[in-house]
């Protein structure tokens, strides 16, 4: 990712950075309109996800997470920006005339070829089942399926990468980007390599307006609110929170409370919890 720095003419351009190489010019048959509603509210209109709302209108890009074009070579034609995710996407022209978007693998260049199937070489961008004999232990993978045929659901964010640790019986052991170690069926497929745009965390928006374009609203501390709005609110002047430990706006512990659903079906598949 090539970071472009502006001349220091104003405070916003002095601190802001943009990617100067990746543009957005999507194909009309691979996009569709998306009705964004809720602004972080549920069906009752109550805020369930804070600091969301506004933002620029977006067109959703149809991403091929299933990689159903088997044993047909495709060529990377463009590398484009996607407003719906941090990762870049690339347009693939397949040999049978099909055109699809996939997640951009790190290091992939325009003109490179990719293919998906059961017996394909271990090459960046190729998709194959975890049971393939050509996929050795220690392979870096992304866009991993949880359910066969449903499409990749794990390790899809910018810079995300998982590692194949072991194969035993009908399952494969993976180490996910969060540090979690879990079992997945060997029949599920994955894409070789790491997701591109690794340096997205190093990018500086430079000003508050750029944050609002992304649909992110300001974050307000609970201690400066009124008691009706937050358990930390109220008091004369700069008062302490008045509790032993910080809490959420709904009174639950804010630091270190487990939010995973109890007795979930996949508990038996997780060998080690994610690292904090």
Swiss-Prot record:
GO terms for cellular component: chloroplast; mitochondrial large ribosomal subunit. Belongs to the universal ribosomal protein uL2 family. Its main location: plastid. The gene is rpl2-B. Part of the 50S ribosomal subunit. InterPro entries: NA-bd_OB-fold, Rib_uL2_dom2, Ribosomal_uL2, Ribosomal_uL2_bac/org-type, Ribosomal_uL2_C, Ribosomal_uL2_CS, Ribosomal_uL2_dom3, Ribosomal_uL2_RNA-bd_dom. Keywords: Chloroplast, Plastid, Ribonucleoprotein, Ribosomal protein. GO terms for biological process: mitochondrial translation. Coiled coil: none annotated. It comes from the Eukaryota. One of its GO terms (molecular function) is structural constituent of ribosome. Residues 1-25, 225-276 are annotated as: Disordered. It is found in: Plastid, Chloroplast. Disulfide bonds: none annotated. Residues 7-25 have a biased composition (Polar residues). This is Large ribosomal subunit protein uL2cy. Gene3D superfamilies: 2.30.30.30, Nucleic acid-binding proteins, Ribosomal protein L2, domain 3.
């Amino acid at each position: 990712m090539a970071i472009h720095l502006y001349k220091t003419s104003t405070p916003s351009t002095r601190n802001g950075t943009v990617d100067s190489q990746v543009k957005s010019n999507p194909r009309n048959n691979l996009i569709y309109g998306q009705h964004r509603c809720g602004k972080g509210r549920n069906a009752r209109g109550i805020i369930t996800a804070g600091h969301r709302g506004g933002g620029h209108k977006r067109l959703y890009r149809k991403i091929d997470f299933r990689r159903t074009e088997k044993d047909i070579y495709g060529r990377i034609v463009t590398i484009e920006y996607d407003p719906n995710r941090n990762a870049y996407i690339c347009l693939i022209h397949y040999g049978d005339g099909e055109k699809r978007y996939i997640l951009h693998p790190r290091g992939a260049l325009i003109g490179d070829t990719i293919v998906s199937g059961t017996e394909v070489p271990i090459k960046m961008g190729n998709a194959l089942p975890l049971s393939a004999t050509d996929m050795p232990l220690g392979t870096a993978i992304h866009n991993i399926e949880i359910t066969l045929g449903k499409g990749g659901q794990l390790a899809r964010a910018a810079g995300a990468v998982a590692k194949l640790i072991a194969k035993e019986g009908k399952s494969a052991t993976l180490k996910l980007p969060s540090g979690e170690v879990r079992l997945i069926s060997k029949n599920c497929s994955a894409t070789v390599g790491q997701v591109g745009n690794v340096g997205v965390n190093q990018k500086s928006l430079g000003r508050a307006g750029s944050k609002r374009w992304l649909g992110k609203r300001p974050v307000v501390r609970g201690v400066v609110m009124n008691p009706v709005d937050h358990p930390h609110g109220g008091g004369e002047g700069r008062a302490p929170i008045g509790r032993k430990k910080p809490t959420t706006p709904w009174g639950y512990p804010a630091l270190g409370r487990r939010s995973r659903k109890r007795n979930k079906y996949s508990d038996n598949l997780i060998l080690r919890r994610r690292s904090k």
